[in-house]
Amino acid sequence: MTEDSQRNFRSVYYEKVGFRGVEEKKSLEILLKDDRLDIEKLCTFSQRFPLPSMYRALVWKVLLGILPPHHESHVQVMTYRKEQYSDVLHALKVIRFVSDATPQSEVYLYMHRLESGKLPRSPSFPLEPEDEVFLAIAKAMEEMVEDSVDCYWIMRCFVNQLNSKYRDTLPQLPKAFEQYLNLEDSRLLSHLKACCAVSTLPYELWFKKCFAGCLPESSLQRIWDKVVSGSCKILVFVAVEILLTFKIKVMALNSAEKITKFLENIPQDSSDAIVSKAIDLWHKHCGTPVHSA
């Protein structure tokens, strides 16, 4: 049996006995052993497979540019990142903008605002819409990333990616959602249109907050793997799958207000299945990236 056929046999066997991720984890470990990490291959892997939790923070930091591809620089670069984190936090404490009682997500927000040159005159100033988005993402990220320095940098770069790389794409996602829902279930879309609900769907929750506050973090991180590695279009298919999963409930609601309220507070127990099906839908419509380790 050749090495490739042995690998394929093992993959099929592992999948049958419930250890689908074993081969994928080995492939990722091979990629992470390279002296110079291959960003393109890491992106492809992240697009195709869920990242193992033990490697997620590292891969995200590399893909978001927090760490350079070269392994030997990682310790030194993270030392600089920690120093910068401490300096910004100290500055906020000196000007009494934050204290030990300030919720961590708000601390991250004010740090981000200070570094962006957009710190308000007082923490009592009302939040901007973009601040609400940041806080939602921050609260979710806190649950995913234990280390506060890692958490801040990943969150900051994740939000910056949404505001720069995806700036022109995100406003187009509601239209794409309508298009793909029509392909998957035209009757469901017709019902939404009949209720005048299409324009009132929770697009900000879905496409600006990337489902933070909508889905539990265990499901959310599998979606964000795809966003971090280059595809915000996965968000469209998560939204479509939510509608397909709760079709019976949505079809029974007869007003835009009721439909939107339900979709903003969907039951959490189906989240893992929704994300798995959404990823399958995404691959079905957009193709599966070819992975080479």
From Swiss-Prot:
<dbReference type="GO" id="GO:0032007">
    <property type="term" value="P:negative regulation of TOR signaling"/>
</dbReference>
<keyword id="KW-0472">Membrane</keyword>
<dbReference type="Pfam" id="PF00566">
    <property type="entry name" value="RabGAP-TBC"/>
</dbReference>
<keyword id="KW-0968">Cytoplasmic vesicle</keyword>
<dbReference type="GO" id="GO:0070848">
    <property type="term" value="P:response to growth factor"/>
</dbReference>
<comment type="function">
    <text>Non-catalytic component of the TSC-TBC complex, a multiprotein complex that acts as a negative regulator of the canonical mTORC1 complex, an evolutionarily conserved central nutrient sensor that stimulates anabolic reactions and macromolecule biosynthesis to promote cellular biomass generation and growth. The TSC-TBC complex acts as a GTPase-activating protein (GAP) for the small GTPase RHEB, a direct activator of the protein kinase activity of mTORC1.</text>
</comment>
<dbReference type="GO" id="GO:0033596">
    <property type="term" value="C:TSC1-TSC2 complex"/>
</dbReference>
<dbReference type="InterPro" id="IPR043039">
    <property type="entry name" value="TBC1D7_dom2"/>
</dbReference>
<protein>
    <recommendedName>
        <fullName>TBC1 domain family member 7</fullName>
    </recommendedName>
</protein>
<dbReference type="GO" id="GO:0062078">
    <property type="term" value="F:TSC1-TSC2 complex binding"/>
</dbReference>
<dbReference type="InterPro" id="IPR039842">
    <property type="entry name" value="TBC1D7"/>
</dbReference>
<keyword id="KW-0343">GTPase activation</keyword>
<keyword id="KW-0963">Cytoplasm</keyword>
<comment type="subunit">
    <text>Component of the TSC-TBC complex (also named Rhebulator complex), composed of 2 molecules of TSC1, 2 molecules of TSC2 and 1 molecule of TBC1D7. Interacts with TSC1 (via C-terminal half of the coiled-coil domain).</text>
</comment>
<dbReference type="GO" id="GO:0090630">
    <property type="term" value="P:activation of GTPase activity"/>
</dbReference>
<dbReference type="InterPro" id="IPR035969">
    <property type="entry name" value="Rab-GAP_TBC_sf"/>
</dbReference>
<dbReference type="InterPro" id="IPR000195">
    <property type="entry name" value="Rab-GAP-TBC_dom"/>
</dbReference>
<dbReference type="GO" id="GO:1904262">
    <property type="term" value="P:negative regulation of TORC1 signaling"/>
</dbReference>
<keyword id="KW-0458">Lysosome</keyword>
<dbReference type="GO" id="GO:0031410">
    <property type="term" value="C:cytoplasmic vesicle"/>
</dbReference>
<dbReference type="GO" id="GO:0005096">
    <property type="term" value="F:GTPase activator activity"/>
</dbReference>
<dbReference type="GO" id="GO:0031398">
    <property type="term" value="P:positive regulation of protein ubiquitination"/>
</dbReference>
<dbReference type="GO" id="GO:0009267">
    <property type="term" value="P:cellular response to starvation"/>
</dbReference>
<dbReference type="GO" id="GO:0005829">
    <property type="term" value="C:cytosol"/>
</dbReference>
<feature type="domain" description="Rab-GAP TBC">
    <location>
        <begin position="50"/>
        <end position="231"/>
    </location>
</feature>
<dbReference type="GO" id="GO:0005765">
    <property type="term" value="C:lysosomal membrane"/>
</dbReference>
